[in-house]
């Protein structure tokens, strides 16, 4: 299992939100490229970059910053936030991203996901499944749908999706621990899963590592790294030392 540091960008700054709430924003740096290089220097093998302006409004005003991040680090970068049509997907790859994360569009227009998989390959397309109380959330987590996350995942599998990013938004930035029950349920799909939301301790990651056999191959860590709850390099050393 790999640990993927999160770099969330809003209005040009590296920020963290709580439960996706803009009013609960903390700015950690005015230089997201520096932050990306920092996590790379601490041993990150992949980065998770989200354009929050894109997620909330659909306008990708941070494109130049994300392009600079991709150029500044020699590790794969997955990029999400407001990617809702084929032009935006192409744009993400053109600026150097290794993976495109699709969220709202996968719910509203799954045909675009199918087209993206056909054009770029299923290994390049990640679908974000964001949920609150088990229900799918879309449009920057502002709208909660009546659809169960597990139902959406099964539909995604039918159209060729192989990798999902699962976030329990009630845990995001709240340090309450990952949604192990939700991950276990989604793992029944046979998908490759990136776990996100709630990680506070290295022990949380050690427990997530036990789900590797169920398809959880990566964990995104955000707030805990920025508040220095633990060191990225310590977490990587601990997780890599565990033999499953």
From Swiss-Prot:
Question: What's in the GO CC field?
Answer: cytoplasm
- Keyword Amino-acid biosynthesis set for record: yes
Q: Provide the catalytic activity annotation.
A: 1-(5-phospho-beta-D-ribosyl)-5-[(5-phospho-beta-D-ribosylamino)methylideneamino]imidazole-4-carboxamide = 5-[(5-phospho-1-deoxy-D-ribulos-1-ylimino)methylamino]-1-(5-phospho-beta-D-ribosyl)imidazole-4-carboxamide
Write down the InterPro entries for this protein, in alphabetical order: Aldolase_TIM, His_biosynth, HisA_bact_arch, Isoase_HisA-like, Isoase_HisA-like_bact, RibuloseP-bd_barrel
Positions annotated as active site in the UniProt record = 8 (proton acceptor), 130 (proton donor)
Where, by residue number, does the polypeptide cross the bilayer?
none
GO molecular function term, any single one: 1-(5-phosphoribosyl)-5-[(5-phosphoribosylamino)methylideneamino]imidazole-4-carboxamide isomerase activity
**Record carries keyword Lyase:** no
The EC number(s) this enzyme carries: 5.3.1.16
Tell me any Pfam family this protein matches.
Answer: His_biosynth
Q: Name one GO biological process term.
A: L-histidine biosynthetic process
Where does the protein principally reside? cytoplasm
Localization, per the record, is:
Cytoplasm
What UniProt keywords are attached to this protein's entry?
A: Amino-acid biosynthesis, Cytoplasm, Histidine biosynthesis, Isomerase
Instruction: Write out the pathway annotation from the protein's UniProt entry.
Output: Amino-acid biosynthesis; L-histidine biosynthesis; L-histidine from 5-phospho-alpha-D-ribose 1-diphosphate: step 4/9
Q: Member of which family?
A: Belongs to the HisA/HisF family.
Name used for this protein in its record = 1-(5-phosphoribosyl)-5-[(5-phosphoribosylamino)methylideneamino] imidazole-4-carboxamide isomerase
| Species assigned in the record | Endomicrobium trichonymphae
Taxon lineage: Bacteria, Pseudomonadati, Elusimicrobiota, Endomicrobiia, Endomicrobiales
Q: Which gene encodes it?
A: hisA
